[in-house]
Each structure stands twice: as structure tokens, then as C-alpha cells.
Amino acid sequence: MKVLGIECTAHTFGVGIFDSEKGVLANEKVTYKGYGIHPREAAELHLKEFDKVLLKALEKANISLKDIDLIAVSSGPGLLPTLKLGNYIAVYLGKKLNKPVIGVNHIVAHNEFARYLAKAKDPLFVYVSGANTQFLAIVNNSWFLVGETLDMGVGNLIDKVARDLGLEFPGGPKIEELAKKGKNLIELPYTIKGLNLQLGGIYTYIKRIKDQYSKEDIAYSLQEWVFALILEIAERAMHMLDKKELILTGGVACNNRLNDMAEQMAKENNFKFYRLPCQYLTDNGAMIAYLGYYWYSQGIYYEPKPRPYWRIWI
């Protein structure tokens, strides 16, 4: 089965093609540039570029639209304008080709695709992106939300600090590079509530003291404290749920320092940690295509329509 996947939840419009026998055949995308996300401007970019991205993916896979058996689209959670456009495109293609169309959950796609790539059995998923920071697991065949941020996502925190330091967008890679030159670990406040966390206090504190320290030390301290906080919760959750495998997903999971710290934590606890390629951690169409295939083969179906606040876990 060949599945075409459309990612359209936020700044990225992606088209991926997944073959049930050969794996990922193509994974093409275009990303909205600029600080923050302006939903309508992002949707305009998607509208302008979708046909080019689609054709590029088909060329990479060396197939035509007629070879597609199923269309999957990210139906949420995400920004309503981009979700509307992406789901409209998917439904239009389905009608034109007379092929079934399935809506899939963006966050579940990140995690199920990561599990597929890692060949993991029963991991704890740490999903770290711009808007989200969540600790997820599969318990009794259902998605279980172990813990999450109670205010802002770690990616948003990093981007906000980067902007306040005068760094260009995207902020994550810039902070990561600056952090390598930092030497002074600044003590930052943080809040853990059970297996939940709050990051707003760190941002407020950095805004107050940013002129007292070098950009390098602020970047270094931000990464060390925030990543340690995330992995502390992950470690506790893994012991609580008796999980032996750890996977980082989402765009922030591209950060090498976070991966190094996760690897060290896993080693100390005799856990298995899976380090995945960055191209499949950021938003992409391949993960949507894969989850579409996986759900469809399991008899799971959701209508392709925008669901900006879609949560399907317990």
C-alpha cells in the first residue's frame, strides 16, 4: 500500500509518501519563515507552495498520483487556517483520484512514526516541540498522557529567549550554538508539579537578568536547566510505568545536547535510548503517511476535518 501524507498543522507544509513494503519513499516540505507564526500568512504559503511540494514528492518517489492507495492528512491539533487548507486539499485529491482519505492526529503521528523508525516496543515518548512538551505512553492499548507543560512548550520558550537576545529565527539552532561557548551556569527557577512542569518562570527570570550575563551563558544555562528538568520527569515516569525504552520526538529533539543528556540518563538507569534523524523529528509528511497507513490497516478511521484542539489520549 502506498500512502500520501499531508502535514499542515502550523508553519510547515509537507508531503510524504510511505510504502508498506519499502518504507519512506519521499519526504518533502516547505516552511514559513519569520518570528512566531501568523496563521493566515502560513496558510497563504501552503496554498502557494503545495503543488510544488506535492510534485517534488511524487518525483522523489518515482510514482504518479494514480499509484496512491490512501491519502492521510494531519487534522489536528494545530492552526485552524492551515488545517482547513490542508484537509481541503486532501479531500479534493481523494475525490479526484477516488481514493479513501483519513484524518490523523499530528502528535500521535510524531510518536508512532518514531516508534516505527526506532523499532521500539514499549517506550516512553518525550514530545518536545514549539507548542508542546508532553510525556506520553501506551497503556492498555490506549494513549496515556503521563505529564505535560502547564504553560508554554519548550520550543516556544527557547524561541522567545532567542528573540530577546536578538537572535535570528529559528531560535533553537542559534541557542544551541551559543550554548557551546557558555561557561557560567546561571541558577534558574523551575517548577515541577507531579509529572507536569512550568516553564514561564524561567522565561520571566531570564528577561529580568539578560543584560547581566553574556548571551553564551544565558543560552548555556537555559539548555542545561530546561533539559535537566524534562529528563528528570522522564526518568521518574519511566520508573513509575516500568518502561525500559526512551524516545525523544518533536523539533526540539533535534538538539544534540538534549540527546546527549538523554543518552547519559538512559545509560545510568539501564534504559534503551533511541536517537533519531532530525529530518523525521520536525514536522513532516512522512509521519502523517505512516500513521495513515497504520491506523487504516488497524481499522481506525477519523474523518478528514480540522480539529485544532484534538486530544485523543486519556
From Swiss-Prot:
Lineage top rank: taxon: Archaea
Catalytic reaction equation(s): L-threonylcarbamoyladenylate + adenosine(37) in tRNA = N(6)-L-threonylcarbamoyladenosine(37) in tRNA + AMP + H(+)
Enzyme Commission number(s): 2.3.1.234
Top EC class of this enzyme: transferase
Family listed: Belongs to the KAE1 / TsaD family.
Gene, per the UniProt record: kae1
Location relative to the cell: Cytoplasm
Stated name of the protein: tRNA N6-adenosine threonylcarbamoyltransferase
Main function: Required for the formation of a threonylcarbamoyl group on adenosine at position 37 (t(6)A37) in tRNAs that read codons beginning with adenine. Is probably involved in the transfer of the threonylcarbamoyl moiety of threonylcarbamoyl-AMP (TC-AMP) to the N6 group of A37.
One cellular component term from this protein's GO annotations in UniProt: EKC/KEOPS complex
Gene Ontology MF: a single term: iron ion binding
Cofactor note: Binds 1 Fe(2+) ion per subunit.
Keyword Cell division set for record: no
Binding-site residues, Fe cation: 106, 110, 127, 283
SUPFAM superfamilies in UniProt: Actin-like ATPase domain
UniProt KW keywords: Acyltransferase, Cytoplasm, Iron, Metal-binding, Transferase, tRNA processing
UniProt cross-references to HAMAP family, sorted A to Z: Kae1
Cofactor or coenzyme needed: Fe(2+)
Example GO BP: tRNA threonylcarbamoyladenosine modification
A Pfam match: TsaD
PANTHER family registered for this protein in UniProt: TRNA N6-ADENOSINE THREONYLCARBAMOYLTRANSFERASE (PTHR11735:SF14)
Sites where the protein binds substrate: 127-131, 159, 172, 176, 255
